[in-house]
Amino acid sequence: MPKSVIIPAGSSAPLAPFVPGTLADGVVYVSGTLAFDQHNNVLFADDPKAQTRHVLETIRKVIETAGGTMADVTFNSIFITDWKNYAAINEIYSEFFPGDKPARFCIQCGLVKPDALVEIATIAHIAK
């Protein structure tokens, strides 16, 4: 099956050569997502909860554009800049995954913009 590019309506163009998501063989791959506005500026500086909510809402739009839901998410890669934000990020994360949680990993690292606190990349398997 060929790959389909997934770009939700109203999405901003990434600054690098990638798209928000791709769909192939019923699997949605969502690119690393940060809390950016339409001009690729970081939103909610110093607010890990608001950034996490924005990131997960953006991811949800990509998955829904592909025909899935957040319940289809099977794996998340989470990158955070400071472990002090871990509990706040998990609080919001749990709102988006209230039932069975997807597998994931979380690492502390630097991100592409200094005000970014969290980045998440996602894989979802859409039921056929």
From Swiss-Prot:
CDD domains: YjgF_YER057c_UK114_family
EC number: 3.5.-.-
This protein's UniProt keywords: Hydrolase
GO MF annotation, one: deaminase activity
Domain of life: Bacteria
EC main group: hydrolase
Signal peptide: none
GO cellular component, one term: cytosol
InterPro entries: RidA_CS, RutC, RutC-like_sf, YjgF/YER057c/UK114
Similarity annotation: Belongs to the RutC family.
Assembly mode: Homotrimer.
Protein name (record): 3-aminoacrylate deaminase RutC
